[in-house]
Amino acid sequence: MSKRPAGSHMEHNDLTDASIIRIPPHHYIHVLDQNTNIARVEVGPLTYIRQDNERVLFSPTRMTMVPPRHYCVILNPVARDDEGHVQFDTAGQAKLRHADLEIRLTQDPFPLYPGEEIQKEVTPLQIVYPDTALRLQALLDFEEESGEKRVAGDEWLFEGPGTYIPRKEVAVLEIIKATVIREHQAIRLRARKEGVDRSGTRRVTGEEWQVSKVGAYLPGAHEEVIDIVNAFILTDKRALHVRALRPFRDAGGRDRRTGEEWLVTVADREAHIPSVAEEVVGVVDVTTLNSREYCVILDPVGPDGKPQLGQKRVVKGERSFFLRPGEHLENGIQDVYVLSEEEGLVLRAVEAFNDTEAQEEDEEEEEEEEQAKKTSVQRRPGDRWMLRGPIEYVPPVTVEVMLRRQAIPLDENEGIYVRDIKTGKVRAVIGHTYMLTHDEELWEKELPPNVEKLLSTVRDPLADRSEHNQNAVAEPRDKTMVVSYRVPHNAAVQVYDYREKKARVVFGPDLVMLGPDEQFTVLSLSGEKPKRANVIKAICLLLGPDFCTDIITIETADHARLQLQLAYNWHFEVKNHSDPAQAAALFSVPDFVGDACKAIASRIRGAVASVQFDDFHKNSIRIICSAVFGFDEKLAVRSSLRFNQNGLVISSVDIQSVEPVDQRTRDALQKSVQLAIEITTNSQEATARHEAERLEQEARGKLERQKITDQAEAERARKELLELEALSAAVESTGAAKAEAQSRAEAARIQGEAAVQEAKLKVEALRIEAEAEMVRLAKAREQELLYKKELDHLEVEKQQKLVTIESQRFKQLVEAIGSETLTAMARAGPELQVKMLQALGLKSTLITDGSSPINLFTTANGLLGAMKAPE
């Protein structure tokens, strides 16, 4: 059955059973003959009378209308003859081309015969715009109107602009749009099938090529666009690194092999579009060197364009270049070595070459200015030499820069340790600026840990000598600098040379600078109270005078054990500092403090052991001094004690405290001391008490006498007070009345004066008010007169101007109308009245009374009944 609108069938379902069916124009119905079972088409306009053996299959349906530029597809179309008429079989049924399609374009409305179906509704024809195309494929073998034969499976393009008329043998695969190729662009194409491209070149399946012509490119039926390739814009600062994917000839006409790499620069072309046989490895930026830069290129490309593997080339600025494929920089761009007079370079030859920039130094290395001359020197691999400034140096590929040396400035009291790497000899350079040669290096001098600690501690050996137990701030030491030590005043330092095996003593104030093989003699002295060994570590020996304190324990003849705290004043006695023997004797006793304290303690113990406690308690200083210093030939106590080994002299002894060691002795001594203090205190207390009692008696007598004197004075004062009170009462009674009368009179006088003053003030106020009112009225009248005067003046000016304006208006009016016109206007009225009276035929008529005057001027107006215009 043919396709019909479902809604129409349901809406007119009742019409199929009617006997009379009215078919409008451009409508049709299918009528089924139930006897022959054959359906036919009835087309309107028609009033169809249905027979009993017929059945209308559907209500009237609108014919199919194909507007212009539209088409539809009919399935199972009817067969037509050469003239386009429908063919019927012997039974009267329309013949159908089953399973066939028919595309119908714009035509008159047509009905669908039984068996026909609309496979595709009315659809607009496809418009192919410019730069677009339809890729078509043949479904059946056919021959086009132009005579070209198509085989099933063939593909071709229908290019615009145009309207595509569909065929049943052709299927539209896709719409192809042209690719716009802009400036510096290309499109990469691939052949989907063997054929000829638009330029006429034969292409095989899978072959790729590029089209770079500016404009729109429409790919062929067997071409596909892989990518749009943008050109690389080449400048003076950018180049392109390209690799060949297969053998080909590049745009410059050179044959390239597979894997070959090269650079495309702006010298070749300004914009480069990589071809299908090229691969872009990367963009290479320009390498720019200024006048103070250089670089070393590894594996440089030779004149033949091939990398020279293992070789180097030095390039110095000013220059700009591109690194070619395979080349790379060693350590990047480097600065040219610009050496001043105080700088130098240690160089080493990596291969044999003839050096034309060598410098030969004079043999005297102490001179500050070293002369040099350019010669040709044959260098062998491994040779080391030094290049001194001032110079600007770029090392060649045969030279390696080992070190950059700079002159080390040294003061008179500064130095460095220098070691010759060839001989191993170490020496100290002191007091002048020095630059190491190519065979020298700085040597680090190692010191014992205790010496390092003493040197790195920022501590004054004289002022901070008692702070040996505190943690001092340590500063790191430069081991290549000459070790120096400032010897303070009245001190000595011993330095021992292990290579020469001799020592030297330096007295302060002076500066000690150690040689490479010299070391300080470290003093290890006893300290604290009582003395302990190895407490104080020191480099310098203080010569004094100074003191040391020690605590010793002694025992008397009666076995009383006492603890003494003694302070000794000491100093070293050196008569000649230049005498090496005397100077060396100072350091002959490593711990002179401990030895001296032990010797003195031994003497004191021996002397006290033969003395009773009471005698020692009373004569302790004499006993200790005699024990320490001894007696001379005259049996007098010596003034000092001298140790001949190192020249130490003990000049005095101070007993700071004496305490018993035994507790019972300490308690008994304390008790006796307390008893003596108590007796003395009681005696002083009794004396003070007697003196206080005497003073108290004297004070008490003075107090009684003072009391009697005060009572007499009080009675005398009371008498005077009573007399004054009586006199005051009399004066008070008399003065009260007098004062009251005086006050009343004074009040009346003041009141009268106030009334008079008030009256005067009121009169003055009224006078002032009256004068002010008169002044105000005068001002007001004056202003009012001025106002009236101005108004009158303005009114006069107004009337004058109005009269002038009116006269001007009348004058201009008269001038505008004219004298003749005015004469005519004046005569027009009377002449009209005369003519009207003449028309009435009146000769002369006068009717009046005696009391009414006659006005001949208005007679005509009265006769004619003219109305006087209201004013």
Curated annotation (Swiss-Prot):
Main location group: cytoplasm
Record bears the keyword Cytoplasm: yes
Q: Which top-level group of life is the source organism from?
A: Eukaryota
Q: Which UniProt keywords apply?
A: Cytoplasm, Nucleus, Repeat, Ribonucleoprotein
Q: Where is the composition biased (Basic and acidic residues)?
A: 687-710
**Cellular component terms (Gene Ontology):** cytoplasm; nucleus; ribonucleoprotein complex
Cellular compartments annotated:
Cytoplasm; Nucleus
Q: What does this protein do?
A: Required for normal vault structure. Vaults are multi-subunit structures that may act as scaffolds for proteins involved in signal transduction. Vaults may also play a role in nucleo-cytoplasmic transport.
Relate the assembly described in the record.
Answer: The vault ribonucleoprotein particle is a huge (400 A x 670 A) cage structure of 12.9 MDa. It consists of a dimer of half-vaults, with each half-vault comprising 39 identical major vault protein (MVP) chains, PARP4 and one or more vault RNAs (vRNAs).
Q: What's the protein here called?
A: Major vault protein
Give the source species.
Ictalurus punctatus (Channel catfish)
